[in-house]
Amino acid sequence: MQKLEKLKSELEGIDIRFNEPLSQYTYTKVGGAADFLVFPRNRYELVRIVNFANQEDIPWMVLGNASNIIVRDGGIRGFVIMFDKLNNVAVDGYMIEAEAGANLIQTTHIALQNSLTGFEFACGIPGSVGGAVFMNAGAYGGEIAHVLVSCKVLTPQGQVKTLDVRDMKFGYRHSLVQETGDIVISAKFALSPGVHRTIRQEMERLTHLRELKQPLEYPSCGSVFKRPLGHFAGQLISEAGLKGHRIGGVEVSEKHAGFMINVDKGTAQDYENLIAHVIERVRENSGITLEREVRIIGESL
């Protein structure tokens, strides 16, 4: 109780929600409660939160905007930090600088408004800029590593530093910050001058492809598995006869087997059980072991 009063006092003015159900915020619509869900408005509030948590030995983590993630049904202890309010985007010539909470799709549309090309590949990728850098998000032959110049990160100790793209150790759905625990707080991208109409047409084409192939009408965590070398996860899952397979309220999408959708009040445990079942069946059928792309965090019930 004393620690709670100290928290309220030292973090006064910051948007803090106590015992907040995370299912309201996740793309899957599953997840238990966070002890303290916080929404910093700027970098200084973020540093205050992290420094307080470290001083008081309270665990903390950043949830981004909870797109390619499954939060377990028991929720998350300590601070869960969401970047919804850290969402400014600025254009300077051919450069775009975006805070980590900026919506990635909206950021690609800002590039379009300024006739800047290079970001079209991301026009349908859900999630935040920070999450996209963390995962080296990509689609249709493009990825964040191709356009990033640098990013500012917050270290686990509460220090802000700048990382150059050459420091980021980018790989397929991988970056340095996955290893270090550094939190991306903003990113700078270098684009190229282009023709507005051409950029718009390419974005419309890619968006149409996504709408045709992906089950965007249901809650989901996006692409569940990484692409195995020389194969497609969705194809392997289909060949194992798993399209439409359901556990609890979660099923393998009929539209795209690489997606798992929440069709009827599914739980995080349903997701975990279905993921494990799919991995096992695909291994039995093809000899290939699928690797998760989606992150699973929090505590089980």
Swiss-Prot record:
Annotated organism of origin: Streptococcus sanguinis (strain SK36)
Localization (cell): Cytoplasm
Protein's GO biological process: cell division; cell wall organization; peptidoglycan biosynthetic process; regulation of cell shape
Xref: InterPro entries: FAD-bd_PCMH, FAD-bd_PCMH-like_sf, FAD-bd_PCMH_sub1, FAD-bd_PCMH_sub2, MurB, MurB_C, MurB_C_sf, Oxid_FAD_bind_N
Cofactor(s) the record lists: FAD
Major localization listed first in the record, in broad terms: cytoplasm
One Pfam family of this chain: MurB_C
Major enzyme class: oxidoreductase
Keywords of the record: Cell cycle, Cell division, Cell shape, Cell wall biogenesis/degradation, Cytoplasm, FAD, Flavoprotein, NADP, Oxidoreductase, Peptidoglycan synthesis
Family of the protein in this entry: Belongs to the MurB family.
Top-rank taxon, per record: Bacteria
Function comment: Cell wall formation.
UniProt domain FAD-binding PCMH-type: residue ranges: 30-194
Active-site residues (renumbered): R173, S223 (proton donor), E293
GO MF term (any one): UDP-N-acetylmuramate dehydrogenase activity
Sequence intervals crossing the membrane: none
Pathway(s) annotated for this protein in UniProt: Cell wall biogenesis; peptidoglycan biosynthesis
Signal peptide: none
Protein name: UDP-N-acetylenolpyruvoylglucosamine reductase
Source organism phylogeny: Bacteria, Bacillati, Bacillota, Bacilli, Lactobacillales
Family matches, as Gene3D superfamilies: 3.30.465.10, UDP-N-acetylenolpyruvoylglucosamine reductase, C-terminal domain, Uridine Diphospho-n-acetylenolpyruvylglucosamine Reductase, domain 2
Gene Ontology cellular component annotations, sorted alphabetically: cytosol
Catalytic activity of the protein: UDP-N-acetyl-alpha-D-muramate + NADP(+) = UDP-N-acetyl-3-O-(1-carboxyvinyl)-alpha-D-glucosamine + NADPH + H(+)
